[in-house]
Amino acid sequence: MRAAVVVFPGSNCDRDLAVAFEQAGFDVSMVWHKDADLPQGIDIVGIPGGFSYGDYLRCGAIAAQSPICKAVVAHTARGGYALGVCNGFQVLTETGILPGALLRNAGLKYICKTVGLKVETSNSVFTEGYNAGDVIGIPIAHHDGNYYADDETLAALKAEDRIAFTYTDNPNGARDDIAGILSANRRVLGMMPHPERAADAGHGGTDGVALFRALAGALTPA
C-alpha cells in the first residue's frame, strides 16, 4: 500500500500524517506542492493540516491552485482515495472535490483542544473501523473550521449518508455540527479534527488509529 502526503509552504502536520499512515502499514511518499504529478501506484493521497501559504486570501484557496492539486483533482476524478485533515479539508472544498466551505469559527477564536466526535456512518473505508453512534475523542486545532453548506447540499449529504462525523458539543458553529464529510463515491474524506494526533498513546489518545487501520485493511491488495 502506498500513500502520498502533500506538503505546502506552511503545512505543519505533514510528518504527523505520514507517521500515522506508516504505523498502519503504508509506504509513504512526501510530495511537494510544485510537483505536477503524484508518484505512480499511489493508493491514497493525504492533505495535511497547517496554514498552507499562510492562509492568505482564504484558507486553502492558494493551495487549491498549486500544481499538485491539479494532480489530486485528477486522482479523485479517476476514483482515487484522498484524506484531507483540517487545512486539507479546506483545500478539498476549495478545489471542489468536496462541497461546502469552512468559515471562521463562530467565536472568532482559534480553538485547540480534544473534542467529542460522533461517528455518523461506518459505511466507508475511513470509518468502517468504528460503529455508527460511537463517540471518540479527537483533537481539533483551527480558526476556520465552521463548516457551511446550503440547504440543498446539506439535504443531499444526509440523504446519501455522507456525513462521517459530527461534534457532540459544537465548538465552532458548523452547520448541523458537521466535523467531516464524504464524497459522493465515498472515497474522499474531509474532516477538521486531527485523527493523526490521536494515533499514539504517548500523545494522549488512540481513537484515531481505527481510521488508519481501516484504510490499510481496505486498500491492502488481495
Curated annotation (Swiss-Prot):
Annotated catalytic residues: C86 (nucleophile), H194, E196
- Keyword match 4Fe-4S: no
Q: Which organism is it from?
A: Ruegeria pomeroyi (strain ATCC 700808 / DSM 15171 / DSS-3) (Silicibacter pomeroyi)
Assembly and partners?
Part of the FGAM synthase complex composed of 1 PurL, 1 PurQ and 2 PurS subunits.
Q: Where is the Glutamine amidotransferase type-1 domain?
A: 3-222
What Pfam families is this protein classified in? GATase_5
Q: Where in the cell is it found?
A: Cytoplasm
The family database entries (HAMAP family) matched by this protein are listed as:
PurQ (MF_00421)
**Originating gene:** purQ
Q: What is this protein called?
A: Phosphoribosylformylglycinamidine synthase subunit PurQ
* Biological process terms in GO annotation: 'de novo' IMP biosynthetic process
- Entries under InterPro entries matching the protein: Class_I_gatase-like, PRibForGlyAmidine_synth_PurQ
Cytoplasm found in the keyword field: yes
